[in-house]
Amino acid sequence: GAICIVEVEARERFEAPPGFTPVDERRYGRARLVFLRAA
């Protein structure tokens, strides 16, 4: 199970690509980190 971390703008819409499942999300100021696990 690989983990992938994606950084996007806090208000940006993000959809996990096929084969990945979001497992956590954190905000830091204007940034948002989305943690994905390979399915």
Regions found by a protein language model. Give the residues of each.
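Class I S-adenosyl-L-methionine-dependent methyltransferase catalytic core
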Residues: 1-39
